[in-house]
């Protein structure tokens, strides 16, 4: 199977999330839990941002939390799906909308093509969104471009063990992608370094959701818009026989009467380095340190 088979069809992603905007919140249990854990991590960071970007905002709960936390900040809610942005902006109260107490803005765009000025953002936040990017170098390069010097990127995404049970149950041959491919934590760290970020910190956490049957797994994925959007996916109807085969294979994972769905969640944060001062040709910086005092 070629690498192109794993490329994400962005038009399909947009349509899927547009359709899922009304059902997303009820099914996004994992996304909520990860968001709260990211907010706890943010408690440890001393930051007073003037501008915050919520990249891949979904229905906007993180945007609201960031706006409440940083009340003097402009918060930009960015998503590829207009349906999600409409939910985000509709959630603002009437008073906030009439009197401008809520300093939030909505932008429909792709993380890989940010329509924002260079060095305009202090904090980029992204909860479980960058797995929908085709080119991680491009995505991190864009984030690094829009961050101000000493700006912070804080994100979560999905690792390669995500939905490993479903991947095993749906595997047919080596010609079609049945579950999206997710990037390893070490490769993400390498991409951050290539993009110019300072000393990225990453760690991983595993979550297991349980279901009565495989259709419950499928329903939740559909409700949050997480369809298989790989270019190498099977394009036709696969029929009742294939579904029965998937159900039978998934049963091999049943434990204590439940079917598991594993999610590997990768957390990361990294800083954009301070801008360097350009010196005339032939000059180099000299660092002075105070001489240690000595007693006589």
UniProtKB/Swiss-Prot annotation:
Transmembrane segments: none annotated. The keyword Lyase does not apply. CDD domains: AdoMet_MTases. It catalyses: malonyl-[ACP] + S-adenosyl-L-methionine = malonyl-[ACP] methyl ester + S-adenosyl-L-homocysteine. GO terms for molecular function: carboxyl-O-methyltransferase activity; malonyl-CoA methyltransferase activity; S-adenosylmethionine-dependent methyltransferase activity. It comes from the Bacteria. Pathway: Cofactor biosynthesis; biotin biosynthesis. It is an enzyme of class 2 (transferase). Belongs to the methyltransferase superfamily. This is Malonyl-[acyl-carrier protein] O-methyltransferase.
């Amino acid at each position: 199977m070629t690498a192109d088979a794993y490329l994400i069809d962005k038009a399909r992603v947009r349509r899927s999330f547009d359709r899922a905007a009304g059902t997303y919140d009820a099914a996004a249990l994992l996304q909520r839990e990860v968001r709260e854990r990211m907010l706890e991590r943010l408690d440890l960071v001393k930051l007073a941002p003037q501008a915050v970007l919520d990249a891949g905002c979904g229905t906007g709960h993180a945007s609201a939390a960031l706006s409440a936390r940083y009340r003097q900040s402009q918060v930009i809610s960015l998503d590829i799906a207009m349906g999600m942005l409409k939910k985000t902006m509709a959630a603002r109260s009437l008073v906030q909308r009439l009197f401008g107490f809520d300093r939030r803005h909505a932008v429909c765009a792709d993380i890989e093509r940010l329509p924002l000025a260079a060095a305009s953002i202090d904090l980029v936040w992204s909860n479980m969104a960058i797995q929908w990017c085709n080119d991680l170098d491009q995505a991190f390069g864009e984030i690094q471009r829009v961050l101000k010097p000493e700006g912070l990127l804080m994100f979560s995404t999905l690792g390669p063990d995500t939905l490993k049970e479903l991947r095993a149950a749906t595997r047919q041959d080596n010609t079609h992608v049945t579950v999206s491919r997710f990037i390893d934590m070490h490769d993400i760290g390498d991409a951050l370094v290539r993009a110019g970020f300072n000393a990225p910190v990453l760690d991983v956490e595993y979550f297991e959701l349980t279901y009565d049957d495989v259709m419950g797994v499928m329903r939740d994925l559909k409700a949050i818009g997480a369809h298989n959007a790989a270019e190498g996916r099977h394009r036709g109807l696969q029929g009742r026989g294939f579904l029965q085969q998937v159900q039978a294979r998934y049963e091999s994972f049943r434990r204590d009467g439940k079917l598991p769905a594993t999610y590997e969640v990768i957390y990361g944060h990294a800083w954009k380095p301070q801008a360097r001062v350009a010196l005339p040709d032939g000059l180099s910086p000299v660092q002075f340190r105070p001489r240690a005092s000595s007693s006589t």
